[in-house]
Design a protein with these regions (language model features):
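Short, small/polar residue-rich loop motifs at catalytic or cofactor-binding pockets
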Residues: 15, 94-96, 114
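Hot-dog-fold acyl-thioester-processing enzymes
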Residues: 1-64, 118-164
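A generic structural motif
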Residues: 72, 102-104, 120
Length: 164
């Protein structure tokens, strides 16, 4: 298991916008934002011991229950990305968090991805409490992130705002 990183927010994931991620508008396609964020989720899961080894050893797995992406500013081919992660809440089976994608050299916010992740028992494929090793680490991460302000993108719903 990796050494627990209690930086707040978690700031461990880096990526580069690949040529195949570019759409006909000349910027990163919406689906590849999700790919980049999914890799950042893998980085988060490594922090509490529920990564690929967790599934490969037939202990359990994690499923995304809900996801919301905001697209704040374009990124293009070759742009370096820095993705941070903030734990918003957790319970015995679930983890609520938000990723923020930044242009790694220019520093602007490109997108966010808010997720609800659930622990799944490998054998039953049903929800299950986090194993003790994961729960303990999640609690430490959540405590480290608790003082952070909740990002304005968290909890958003999709709607057209009408002027009254």
């Amino acid at each position: 298991m990796v050494e627990l990183d209690l930086s707040a927010p978690l700031d461990r994931h880096r990526a580069t916008v690949l040529p195949e991620w570019i759409d006909w508008n000349g910027h990163m396609n919406v689906g590849f934002y999700v790919v980049a964020f999914d890799k950042a989720t893998d980085t988060l899961c490594e922090q509490f011991g529920c990564s690929w080894d967790y599934t490969r050893q037939e202990i359990g797995m994690t499923f995304v229950l809900e996801a919301h992406v905001t697209y704040d500013r374009e990124v293009t081919q070759g742009d370096p990305l820095r993705i941070t992660t903030q734990i918003l809440d957790h319970d015995a089976k679930r983890l609520h968090f938000i990723h923020a994608m930044y242009h790694a050299t220019e520093g602007y916010l490109a997108a966010t991805n808010e997720l609800m992740l659930m622990n799944i028992d490998y054998a039953s494929r049903r929800s299950a409490p986090w194993p003790d090793f994961a729960r303990e680490r999640i609690e430490k991460l959540a405590a480290a992130h608790k003082p952070l302000p909740v990002p304005e993108q968290a909890g958003r719903i999709i709607a057209i705002k009408r002027k009254k």
